[in-house]
Structure formats: C-alpha cells, structure tokens
Amino acid sequence: MTNIRKHHPLAKMINHSFIDLPTPSNISSWWNFGSLLGLCLVIQITTGLFLAMHYTPDTTTAFSSITHICRDVNYGWIIRYLHANGASMFFICLFMHIGRGLYYGSFTFLETWNIGVILLFAVMATAFMGYVLPWGQMSFWGATVITNLLSAIPYMGTNLVEWIWGGFSVDKATLTRFFAFHFILPFIITALAMVHLLFLHETGSNNPSGISSDPDKIPFHPYYTTKDLLGVILLLLALFSLVLFSPDLLGDPDNYTPVNPLNTPPHIKPEWYFLFAYAILRSIPNKLGGVLALALSILILILIPFLHTAKQRSMMFRPLSQCLYWMLAADLLTLTWIGGQPVENPFITIGQVASIIYFSTILILMPLTNLLENKLLKW
C-alpha cells in the first residue's frame, strides 16, 4: 500500500499534498480554515449541481422554480438552504482565513497571497450572481444597483453596463448569463485553489511564531487530518443548526416577493458578507469616488505585503500592532452594521468615520506602528 502511495503518479501527488506533507508542529486552529474552505466549496458545488437540475434561468419561471424546489422536490428545501447558508459559512471561513494571514504575516508568501486575493474576487462575483438567481425583489434591485455602478467609469461606463445587462435593463438575458457564470465560476475557483495550494507547498506553511519551522516539522497525517476533522464537525454542526432551525436568518424577506420593476424596496442592500464594502461605497457622496473606494477596499489586500515595515513577521510578539489589528476587526464589524442601515444620520456619519479608519489603519497607522515597534525592540 505504501508503495502505491509513494510511486503511483496520481497517488504520489495526493500523498505529497495531504499525507506526508511536512507541516510546522505548532500551527494553531487558525490554520483549520483552509481545509474548511475546501469543504465549503465541495458543499456548494454539490448542492448547486442538484439545484441546477430543477432551476430554470428564465424571468417568468425562475421564482416559481425555486418554490417548486422547496415544495415538490425530495429534500429540495434542505438542498436550497444548505446552498444559501453554505455561502454564509464560506464567507465566515474566508474572512477568518484572511484575518489569520494578516495577523501572522502569511502575506509574505507573495504568490500564494495574490492568488488568494484573486480567489476572494472570484468567490464574491459568484456569490453576487447567485443572489440574483432566485429572482426576488432584492435579487433584481441588487443586480440593478450593483451593475449600475460600472456606469461611473468615464466614457465607456454606460455601454459597459448595457453590454453586461444584454439590453437596456436587468432582464432575461442578464439572468441567463448570470446563471451560466454562476455555474462555471466554482470550477474556476477550484482550479485557482489548486494553484493556491501549489504555491503554498513550494514554501511550506507559516506558523504562529513567524520564524522558520524547518527544524521542527511533522507529517500532515495523522496529526492535522485529525485536527481538521474537529473543524469539519464544528462547521457542519453550525451549518446544519442554521439550516434546520433558522434557515432565513441571514436572508432578506424582500427576496420572497417576486420581481416587480415598478416597485423599489425601501432599503436595497446586498447579502451580509458584502455590507462592509457597501458601507464604504455609500460613505462617499461622489459616484465614481464611491466605486473606486469599493474596489480599493478589497484591492488594498494586494498592497499589504509592501506596507509591511516590521522586522518581525508575526504580530504574536507585537502588542501595539495587535491593538490596531483588533481595532480594524471592530471597524469592519461596524461597517457591516452600517451597510444594513438606511441612508440617514447618524448612520451616514458613522459610515464615513469607519471608512476613514479602515483605510488610514491599513495605509498609515500599521506601517508607522511597525516602524515604532522596530525602534522599541531595538532592531
């Protein structure tokens, strides 16, 4: 058996990636989220495939096909809610994974980090297009508002929006192409995840201390397969609790109303995992400025390795940076809350202050704090 595992071309690849992989002996539970993201992706592709068997991407039947899935298809309701809430779990794991990378300095693996940022964009695009497919009120108006942002691009904006719509408004052509892209993107994400792992295994994993773990490695199996299994059980417990007890907790009630282009919902808002970026978009009165801030709120992750001025990689022994990090985490939670509130005072002011704190913390305060810590630690 060992012979096959170590010499068969396919088994050898799996062996080097998941069984005999040399892994730092001190990585904490924060390193579990990579495997949990893989699990989420498998859940999403599987449930999505079964949903696609019954869904019809047509403006006249899309909403009723979702109703049909929930009422008439065997266990259709659980497949639908696993898919919807699985997306929320995906983003929780994604934010934790990125947060761990920021805290422990994993962004110094440049290729792995940049592929990760591309993956984040791909997952966000997939989730956005998936939100349009049920063809409820929030699906339609969310699609209209978010795609309309591209009209802020000078000279070519309006043409670009109409090209994406496939007409002069969000309609049948838009729904059909969003379904096609929503179906294909998870497979592209899978390919990108493999590239992400390929680059990671070139350098080996980081660890909480941030120093080289070459002298102290252990095999991935059985130590970390067992540890990952605990994460898997906890994730599935949380997901099934959500699906079976409160499946609509994270959804929007407006999406249970079929599309009516003549009736705008009082508060148009995306799913909870986009609210922080949506709050940044809304905090700037100028349309183009808002769109640029929205894009930069995610693209700023690419700059982080170049803004890292500390001599120590991890924040584990840097208390000042830790304070800033948790301030940034609290700020993102504030932005998420503001994104779900109506556009009126005091929410407008809070959103603007939180947006300024977000950008200034990453671009100014963190690099300066790193330099100060270098001085204090006499590097």
Swiss-Prot record:
<dbReference type="GO" id="GO:0008121">
    <property type="term" value="F:ubiquinol-cytochrome-c reductase activity"/>
</dbReference>
<keyword id="KW-0496">Mitochondrion</keyword>
<dbReference type="GO" id="GO:0046872">
    <property type="term" value="F:metal ion binding"/>
</dbReference>
<dbReference type="InterPro" id="IPR048260">
    <property type="entry name" value="Cytochrome_b_C_euk/bac"/>
</dbReference>
<protein>
    <recommendedName>
        <fullName>Cytochrome b</fullName>
    </recommendedName>
</protein>
<keyword id="KW-0679">Respiratory chain</keyword>
<feature type="binding site">
    <location>
        <position position="201"/>
    </location>
    <ligand>
        <name>a ubiquinone</name>
    </ligand>
</feature>
<dbReference type="Pfam" id="PF00032">
    <property type="entry name" value="Cytochrom_B_C"/>
</dbReference>
<keyword id="KW-0812">Transmembrane</keyword>
<feature type="transmembrane region" description="Helical">
    <location>
        <begin position="178"/>
        <end position="198"/>
    </location>
</feature>
<keyword id="KW-0999">Mitochondrion inner membrane</keyword>
<dbReference type="InterPro" id="IPR005798">
    <property type="entry name" value="Cyt_b/b6_C"/>
</dbReference>
<keyword id="KW-0472">Membrane</keyword>
<feature type="binding site" description="axial binding residue">
    <location>
        <position position="97"/>
    </location>
    <ligand>
        <name>heme b b566</name>
    </ligand>
</feature>
<dbReference type="GO" id="GO:0045275">
    <property type="term" value="C:respiratory chain complex III"/>
</dbReference>
<feature type="transmembrane region" description="Helical">
    <location>
        <begin position="320"/>
        <end position="340"/>
    </location>
</feature>
<keyword id="KW-0408">Iron</keyword>
<feature type="binding site" description="axial binding residue">
    <location>
        <position position="182"/>
    </location>
    <ligand>
        <name>heme b b562</name>
    </ligand>
</feature>
<feature type="binding site" description="axial binding residue">
    <location>
        <position position="196"/>
    </location>
    <ligand>
        <name>heme b b566</name>
    </ligand>
</feature>
<feature type="transmembrane region" description="Helical">
    <location>
        <begin position="288"/>
        <end position="308"/>
    </location>
</feature>
<comment type="function">
    <text>Component of the ubiquinol-cytochrome c reductase complex (complex III or cytochrome b-c1 complex) that is part of the mitochondrial respiratory chain. The b-c1 complex mediates electron transfer from ubiquinol to cytochrome c. Contributes to the generation of a proton gradient across the mitochondrial membrane that is then used for ATP synthesis.</text>
</comment>
<dbReference type="InterPro" id="IPR036150">
    <property type="entry name" value="Cyt_b/b6_C_sf"/>
</dbReference>
<keyword id="KW-0349">Heme</keyword>
<feature type="transmembrane region" description="Helical">
    <location>
        <begin position="347"/>
        <end position="367"/>
    </location>
</feature>
<feature type="transmembrane region" description="Helical">
    <location>
        <begin position="226"/>
        <end position="246"/>
    </location>
</feature>
<dbReference type="GO" id="GO:0005743">
    <property type="term" value="C:mitochondrial inner membrane"/>
</dbReference>
<feature type="transmembrane region" description="Helical">
    <location>
        <begin position="113"/>
        <end position="133"/>
    </location>
</feature>
<dbReference type="InterPro" id="IPR027387">
    <property type="entry name" value="Cytb/b6-like_sf"/>
</dbReference>
<comment type="subunit">
    <text>The cytochrome bc1 complex contains 11 subunits: 3 respiratory subunits (MT-CYB, CYC1 and UQCRFS1), 2 core proteins (UQCRC1 and UQCRC2) and 6 low-molecular weight proteins (UQCRH/QCR6, UQCRB/QCR7, UQCRQ/QCR8, UQCR10/QCR9, UQCR11/QCR10 and a cleavage product of UQCRFS1). This cytochrome bc1 complex then forms a dimer.</text>
</comment>
<dbReference type="InterPro" id="IPR005797">
    <property type="entry name" value="Cyt_b/b6_N"/>
</dbReference>
<keyword id="KW-1133">Transmembrane helix</keyword>
<dbReference type="InterPro" id="IPR048259">
    <property type="entry name" value="Cytochrome_b_N_euk/bac"/>
</dbReference>
<feature type="transmembrane region" description="Helical">
    <location>
        <begin position="77"/>
        <end position="98"/>
    </location>
</feature>
<dbReference type="GO" id="GO:0006122">
    <property type="term" value="P:mitochondrial electron transport, ubiquinol to cytochrome c"/>
</dbReference>
<feature type="binding site" description="axial binding residue">
    <location>
        <position position="83"/>
    </location>
    <ligand>
        <name>heme b b562</name>
    </ligand>
</feature>
<keyword id="KW-0830">Ubiquinone</keyword>
<dbReference type="InterPro" id="IPR030689">
    <property type="entry name" value="Cytochrome_b"/>
</dbReference>
<keyword id="KW-0249">Electron transport</keyword>
<keyword id="KW-0813">Transport</keyword>
<feature type="transmembrane region" description="Helical">
    <location>
        <begin position="33"/>
        <end position="53"/>
    </location>
</feature>
<keyword id="KW-0479">Metal-binding</keyword>
<dbReference type="InterPro" id="IPR016174">
    <property type="entry name" value="Di-haem_cyt_TM"/>
</dbReference>
